[in-house]
Regions:
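Beta/alpha (TIM)-barrel catalytic core signal, keyed to glycine-rich beta->alpha loops juxtaposed to Asp/Glu
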Residues: 4-152
Length: 152
């Protein structure tokens, strides 16, 4: 980002990054500090911290995507524990699984935005409903762990 600062005079106001519950490398290196895990390696130059310090809005694209472009994780057999926890929270809040997955991203203190890329009115309404849900920290971390991410 320092190179960009040197040569580009326009302020950077947003940065689009891939981010979902299973694809959460953006937060992994900050949480897996001093662990010998792939997530503990700084792959992005601390992009999350840089954007927060410089008031750059992070926009999460593919918010329902699994790693390696395997499709949507919602309802996938590859994430049974995650989907079960999402269903429990969806029932608790009276919303859809999509709403909970979107609320997980919106709950992060970086005040991220979602890039939905949907043409479905139903899905868009479910995503918008996430603005009215504030997951607890415990719920946020339960979903993070259920996706298979480690914590120290």
């Amino acid at each position: 980002m320092c190179i960009r600062d040197r040569y580009v005079r326009q302020p950077l106001v947003a940065n689009q990054v891939q981010f979902s519950i299973p694809v959460s490398n953006l937060v992994a290196n900050g949480m897996e500090v001093n662990m010998e895990t792939p997530g503990s390696v700084d792959h992005d130059g601390s992009l999350l911290d840089y954007c927060r310090l410089h008031d750059i809005t992070l926009q999460a694209w593919s918010p329902f995507q699994m790693p390696s472009w395997k499709g949507c994780f919602l309802g996938s057999d590859e994430y049974p524990e995650l989907n079960q926890k999402i269903r429990v929270l969806a029932e608790k809040y009276g919303v859809s699984d999509t709403t909970i997955a979107a609320a997980w991203i919106l709950r992060h203190p970086a005040n991220m935005q979602l890039v939905t890329g949907t043409a479905s009115e139903k899905r868009l309404k479910e995503i918008i409903a996430a603005c009215n849900i504030t997951l607890t920290r415990e719920e946020w971390y339960e979903l993070y762990l259920a996706a298979g991410h480690p914590l120290p």
